[in-house]
């Protein structure tokens, strides 16, 4: 992969952040980030991270950001149309660009769907972390200086009090044995505040935790003003 130019799908979480670090360490030039946000909410889809934090993250990476808005309760048809539009904008900005990376780790069905979608849009998808031992990867992330906080917890898989906790060694010790240490089965999502992929840390302030769809506990965060 050395020497390639690449776009990165950015979720605001640890896997995308670590994929960025891995690619940069491998000699890949990541030229920009692309992120989907839910229209009307101004938050990253799935993670629920505010747009203001997304912008702070992009600034910390010193990479340009392409924002793609999708409707609430988005189906595949609407998602694919919005994503295609975002990739078209990327190619207009970086003519000839044809590779996009995702931070997928384990789920083959999701990876297969994305590979097929990207191929239809004349892009090649790269998953630099796919197949990693997630126990080792989680510890490697923490040892490497990644700082993240759980911003969403699936309460059908984890107790609600895990929402808002730091993604640290203490969290890994407390996770039930059947829970993936990287939350790769949807057990939790994270918001990254610092790491080797950032030029500087971002400071966030924790807000309230709310339950959505009688299942998902979202902890709100805002940029902490100096």
List each model region and its residues.
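Nucleotide-activated chemistry modules centered on ATP-dependent adenylation/adenylyltransferase
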Residues: 1-226
């Amino acid at each position: 992969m050395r020497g390639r130019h690449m776009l990165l799908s950015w979720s605001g979480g640890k896997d995308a952040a670590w994929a960025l670090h891995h690619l940069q360490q491998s000699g890949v030039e990541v030229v920009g980030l692309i992120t989907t946000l839910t229209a009307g909410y101004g938050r990253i889809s799935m993670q629920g991270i505010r747009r203001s934090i997304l912008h702070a993250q992009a600034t910390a990476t010193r990479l340009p950001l392409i924002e793609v808005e999708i409707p609430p309760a988005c189906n595949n048809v609407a998602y694919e149309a919005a994503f295609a539009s975002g990739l078209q904008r990327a190619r207009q900005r970086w003519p000839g660009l044809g590779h996009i990376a995702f931070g997928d780790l384990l789920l083959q069905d999701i990876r297969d769907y994305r590979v097929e979608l990207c191929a239809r849009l004349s892009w090649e998808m790269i998953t630099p972390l796919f197949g990693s031992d997630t126990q080792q990867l989680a510890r490697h992330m923490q040892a490497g200086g990644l700082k993240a906080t759980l911003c969403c917890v699936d309460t059908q898989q984890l107790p609600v009090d895990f929402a808002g906790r730091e993604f640290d060694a203490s969290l890994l010790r407390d996770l039930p044995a059947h829970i993936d240490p990287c939350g790769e089965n949807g057990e939790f999502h994270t918001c990254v505040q610092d790491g080797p992929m950032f030029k500087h840390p971002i400071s966030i302030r924790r807000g309230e935790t709310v339950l959505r769809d009688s299942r998902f506990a979202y902890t709100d965060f805002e940029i902490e003003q100096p």
